[in-house]
Each structure stands twice: as C-alpha cells, then as structure tokens.
C-alpha cells in the first residue's frame, strides 16, 4: 500500500503488487520520500501502480533523524489537512519545494517548517490575517495579540479574547513568513523567544482546525529540547 500526494488528484492510496521484491520494476518507486511520475489505474476501490519514473529521491532524509522527522511531519500535515483526492495545487507546490529545501540544508528547518505551516493554513482555508484587525477591520501595522478563533491580529481597541499575547517581533515574523516564498525565508533572523512563540501559535491552530493533532509534533518538541 502506498500513500501518494499528486499534483492533480490530491492524496491517494495505491497498491503496488510485488513491489517488495528487489527485482520488481516497482521496487524503487515505492521507497519513502520519492518524487516522480507514476502511472496508475483505478480498480474497484484503490488505485494500482503500473509503472513510473523517479525524478528526485529525498532518500538522504531517511538517514538523518532531524530531516526525517521534519519530512514526516510535512507528510502528516498533508494527510490531516486534505480529504482523499482533494486537489490542491498550491499546497502541492509548497510541499515539494519544502522537501527540496530540507534536503539541501540551505535554510533553517525550523524556520522553513513555520513558513510551510502558515501556507498550509492559507491554502486550506484557515489563513491568518495580519493587515487588518479581525474584528473592526481597521488597518494594522503591527499587533501584540493573535485571535486563535478568528485567525488574525487584533488592534488595541478591540477585545482580547480566545487568543494569545505575543511579541510584536513575533507578529512581524508571522506576517513575513506568511507572505514570503519558502526559498526566501532565510532572510529572517529570529530570537529563541520569537521562535517559541511562532511554534506556539502555529501548533495550536493546526491542532485545533484539522481532524486530528499531528503526532510528529511530539518528536519535533523532543528535537528542540
């Protein structure tokens, strides 16, 4: 059984008969964290993998605990945020880009993951709003409070309920990561306090809005400690 995230069909489950045999033409196609072209046929229930070609393998992530944990977390986020066969091209593009960047070690994994989490929320209908107060809609240059119920910043005049107080530097970091392409987030330098607040905001929202809480978050906490 394979879990495949596709460009046009969303996430699907497929059968690869005989793929465990080393001489099978499907053997290399079924390795974890492979990006490629796959020929699938729809059976009575599941898809069946017929053949394919690997474009890029992220196998180096399998031998590095930190890389593997972050890559597994990305996969889990896709799994919990999308229904089967729910197309989401923007999220697919961000997912592949993030795997590439993790593999190259060009950007801090933690920074990269926070940016991906914000884009995941955006492309699944839970995007945070930073430019206007979520209550009165007045323009915001910065805020020290995020509403976790209404997904955005709150101005000084509106009630601070169902949310978190954060540093203004954290607010600006959230806005930057939300609006910046993944390959450009390296420009941001953060204090440990801001990193902790970013994690608190995104992890709370992700655990609240999707069908289940990502289990990989516990391993991420362990790595941070």
Swiss-Prot record:
It comes from the Bacteria. One of its GO terms (cellular component) is bacterial nucleoid. The keyword Nuclease does not apply. The keyword DNA repair applies. Keywords: DNA damage, DNA recombination, DNA repair. GO terms for biological process: DNA recombination; double-strand break repair. SUPFAM superfamilies: ArfGap/RecO-like zinc finger, Nucleic acid-binding proteins. It holds the Pfam family RecO_N. Involved in DNA repair and RecF pathway recombination. Belongs to the RecO family. This is DNA repair protein RecO. It comes from Clostridium perfringens (strain SM101 / Type A). The gene is recO.
């Amino acid at each position: 059984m394979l879990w495949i995230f596709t460009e046009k069909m969303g996430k699907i489950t497929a059968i690869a008969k005989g793929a465990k045999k080393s001489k099978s033409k499907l053997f290399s196609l079924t390795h974890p964290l492979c990006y490629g072209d796959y020929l699938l046929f729809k059976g009575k229930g599941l898809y069946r993998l017929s053949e394919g070609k690997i474009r890029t393998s992220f196998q180096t992530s399998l031998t590095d605990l930190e890389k593997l944990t972050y890559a597994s977390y990305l996969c889990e986020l896709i799994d919990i945020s999308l229904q089967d066969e729910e197309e989401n091209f923007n999220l697919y593009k961000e997912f592949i880009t993030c795997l590439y960047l993790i593999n190259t070690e060009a950007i801090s994994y933690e920074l990269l993951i926070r940016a991906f989490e914000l884009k995941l929320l955006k492309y699944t209908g839970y995007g945070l709003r930073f430019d206007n107060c979520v209550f009165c809609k007045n323009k915001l240059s910065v805020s020290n409070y995020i509403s976790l119920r209404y997904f955005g910043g709150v101005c000084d005049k509106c009630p601070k309920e169902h949310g978190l107080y954060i540093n203004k530097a954290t607010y600006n970091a959230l806005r930057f990561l939300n609006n910046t392409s993944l390959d450009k987030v390296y420009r941001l330098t953060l204090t440990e306090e801001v990193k902790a607040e970013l994690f608190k905001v995104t992890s709370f929202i992700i655990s609240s809005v999707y069908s289940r809480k990502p289990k990989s978050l516990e391993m991420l906490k362990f790595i941070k400690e």
